[in-house]
């Protein structure tokens, strides 16, 4: 999940306007501390959470998980 954490952080930091982890979590429909915990590797996202994050950033789940380099 190390690759997931790094990609998630990179996506969040590049998205305009820049949003903090709590706001990003809320916009994805996740608990307020979810993005922080995922970026730090403290938690593993559920399939439902992966779908919400992928939809928010308009990327594939395969990209988030490091299975492909194409967004």
Please identify what each model-predicted range represents.
Residues 17-37:
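Short alpha-helical DNA-recognition segment
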Residues 48-63:
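DNA major-groove recognition helix of helix-turn-helix/homeodomain DNA-binding modules
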Residues 1-17:
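A short, Lys/Arg-rich alpha-helix, primarily the initiator
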Residues 9, 21-22, 51:
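Residues within the helices of the helix-turn-helix
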Residues 40:
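Short, conserved catalytic or interaction motifs in soluble domains
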Residues 2, 14, 65-71:
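Short, charged recognition helix plus adjacent turn
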């Amino acid at each position: 999940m190390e690759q997931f954490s790094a990609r998630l952080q990179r996506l969040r930091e590049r998205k305009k306007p820049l949003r903090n982890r709590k706001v990003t979590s809320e916009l994805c429909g996740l608990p307020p501390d979810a993005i922080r915990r995922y970026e730090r590797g403290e938690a593993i996202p559920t399939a439902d959470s992966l779908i919400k994050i992928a939809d928010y950033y308009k990327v594939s789940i395969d990209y988030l998980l490091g299975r492909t380099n194409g967004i």
